Amino acid sequence: MPINPQGCKSLDAFRTLREGKTLYLPNFGMETLHHVHAEDVAGVFFAAIQTGKSAYGEGFHAVSPRAVTLTGYAREAASWYGKEADLAYEPYETWKARVSKEDAESALTHMLHSPSGSMEKAKRLLDFVPKHTNYEAVRECLQSFGEL
């Protein structure tokens, strides 16, 4: 299940966008998410094994080429359904009443950390570049759930 534009795992946000309804985002929607495709995670591991000594003792991120904001993500996801995103923003404390406790906690964790990693080290030491963007990883996941 992909993390959705609200920062949680519910498919409800995607369904709201598909239906052209207003999607409420927490805070200002400028927090970031950084998805990764499973093939790219495996690719980093495989490249590290193949490279050998230059990878020993090193840590590598496995992420797509760049992070996305909640707002940008919502707009892109709406376009997959042929829609324009109708977005509204609420302070987290107000917004969390709209979702389950689990989703509210997940969103808060993502907002507080606002993940954004770099693949530069993997490129430099392993000659590895991810094959998939954030959006490609999410789209493929949604397709597997029959949501696209």
Language model regions located:
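A conserved pocket-lining segment of Rossmann-fold NAD(P)-dependent short-chain dehydrogenase/reductase
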Residues: 15-36
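Mid/C-terminal beta-alpha module of Rossmann-like enzyme folds, strongest
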Residues: 47-106
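Non-catalytic, hydrophobic alpha-helical segments
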Residues: 41, 45, 62, 73, ...
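Conserved loop-to-helix N-cap of the C-terminal "lid" that shapes the substrate pocket in Rossmann-like
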Residues: 29, 34-42, 59, 67-71, ...
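Amphipathic terminal alpha-helices
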Residues: 132-148
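Flexible, glycine-rich beta-alpha linker
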Residues: 1-13
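Glycine-rich, aromatic-lined ligand/substrate-binding cores of catalytic
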Residues: 21-22, 38-48
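Conserved C-terminal active-site "lid" loop/helix of NAD(P)H-dependent oxidoreductases
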Residues: 38, 71, 97-129
